[in-house]
Structures are given as C-alpha cells and as structure tokens.
Regions:
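Conserved N-terminal segment of class I S-adenosyl-L-methionine
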Residues: 1-94, 98, 115, 214-216, ...
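Surface-exposed loop/turn positions
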Residues: 29, 125-126
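Short glycine-/acidic-enriched loop or helix-start segments at secondary-structure transitions
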Residues: 43, 64, 110-111, 139-141
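Active-site micro-motifs of SAM-dependent methyltransferase domains
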Residues: 87, 106, 137
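A short beta-strand submotif of the Rossmann-like class I SAM-dependent methyltransferase core
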Residues: 101-102
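Helix-to-beta-strand junctions that scaffold the AdoMet/dcAdoMet cofactor pocket
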Residues: 108-109, 122-123
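S-adenosyl-L-methionine-dependent methyltransferase catalytic module, highlighting the catalytic core
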Residues: 112-117, 127-248
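Active-site beta-strand termini and strand-to-loop segments that position acidic
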Residues: 250-252
Length: 252
C-alpha cells in the first residue's frame, strides 16, 4: 500500500501537471498504463473521470491494484489485464488518448520492437508519457532495493561487469531471486541516447522532454525537492551519469 500511495501522489502532483502542459485531460480520455503494477498511477486518472486500462505481467500486483482501488467511486471505469503487452492486440483493447509508461521502459526487452508495436494502440492525437531513470545514473540499476544497506546506497554499483556485479550482490547476502531481477534490469536498462535513437527511428514527434537532476519521485520517497537539470549541464553522454530521471511526451 505504501508504494501505491507513493505512485498516486507523484502522478497527481507531477505527472498529470506535466502532461497538461501539452493537453487538457478530460473525462472522455481513454488512458492505458503499461506496467501498471499496483495501480497507484491510475488512481489520479480515475479521479479525473477517465476510462482506464492497466496491463501488467505480475498477477499478484494486479490483485493488489483491484483491492486498493475497489473502494474508489470510479472503480467500474478501470479494467486490469494480466498479460505481456506484446501479446495484447489493439483489436482487444482499442486505441487510447493517453498512454503512460512510468518507470517501465527500462524493464521491457526488445525496446525497438516494443516502440514499433506501441503505435497499434495510438490514434493520430494520442500522447505517450515516459518517465524513466537513465541507465548510467547513480541508481539506474534499481539496486537501492538491495536489503544490504551498504549496497543499496552505493552509487553506480550496477555499472560493474556482470560477473563482478553478481559476486558483489552474493557477498552482500542478496537472494537469488533479487540478484536475477537486478541482472535482468542490467540487460534492459536504457540510456538517453538509445531512447532518443529509437524514437527518431520510429519517427515519433517529441512534444516535450525534461532532464531531472533530482527525480520528482524522490520528494515522495526521500523528501528531496525535484530539480530540473540546467541546460548547461545537459552534456550528451556525460549527463547520463547524473540525470536521475527523464520525462518525455511523444506522439506519432
């Protein structure tokens, strides 16, 4: 429930205002969240009267989402689907006015293929929001989830070679399941340059993008005030090492 509340608060306070710099979200909107987890990001859109669909491969998290949102007055306006987005067709769920991927793209394998298929769920005016940690940032490998307090606070740990990274995690007493999850993130983590190369190749139009020195979500988790990275520090490749989050709005 804690993570659900963190998601809901950050989306309500930062993500929705960011999107509304480009488009006003109205009750007529159909909203798709890919990788919805426990549904915290969906709650603020239900508050706005939107029709929502949440897709995730984690059945347990989806059951939590249903439980947490069951008392919401707009619960009948949300549908949850337990599946891989790559196995879902637009014939099944249709197209959407807004698609949300928050802290998700860095977990998806074959990102080029995914970004191509994403268009199947878009009409000409669909806007897609991406929020993701750049791979090379101090905690881009999500190793802050480690139980070992030293490892969870060690910046850039995930940039070690795979074999050494695995050994360090084992030394730190992490479970085999957590080690495997962190190694999978290492396989799919995405750099800013690579993300931009993919959207350029797929001919998406970038409506807005923002580099964050301090991720907006860090305010909810750690009490740190969000901070946009100054333009003069947005140095290609180098800024990947200190940009903790990117926000993007794109369309076809």
């Amino acid at each position: 429930m804690i993570y659900f509340r963190e998601q809901a608060k950050c989306t309500r306070k930062y993500v929705i205002p960011y999107i509304e710099q480009v488009v006003s979200i109205t009750p007529r909107f159909r909203v798709l969240e890919i990788g919805c987890g426990e549904g915290g990001n969906i709650e603020p859109f239900l508050d706005l009267g939107c029709q929502c669909v949440g897709i995730d491969i984690d059945v347990v998290q989806l059951e939590n989402a249903k439980k947490y949102l069951s008392s919401h007055p707009g619960f009948e306006r949300v549908t949850f689907i337990a599946n891989d987005i790559n196995k879902v067709s637009s014939e099944e769920i249709g197209c959407f006015d807004l698609i949300i991927l928050r802290d998700v793209i860095e977990h998806i394998p074959n990102q080029e293929q995914f970004m191509h298929r994403l268009k199947n769920f878009m009409h000409d005016d669909t806007i897609v929001f991406f929020g993701f940690p750049v791979w090379c940032n101090p905690f881009g490998g999500h190793h802050q989830i480690c139980c070992n307090k030293v490892l969870s606070h060690m910046p850039w740990l995930h940039l070690l070679p795979n074999a050494l990274y695995k050994k360090v995690l084992q030394w730190g007493g992490e479970t085999q399941g957590k080690i495997q999850a962190l190694l999978e993130i290492k396989e799919t983590g995405i750099s800013l340059h690579r993300f931009e190369r993919i959207i350029h190749k797929e001919q998406y139009k970038v409506l807005q993008h923002t580099h964050y020195l301090i991720n907006p979500n860090y305010e909810i988790k750690f009490g740190l005030r969000p901070c946009v990275l100054p333009k003069w520090l947005q140095i290609p490749y180098l800024s990947d090492f200190y940009t903790t989050a990117m926000y993007y709005l794109i369309k076809k």
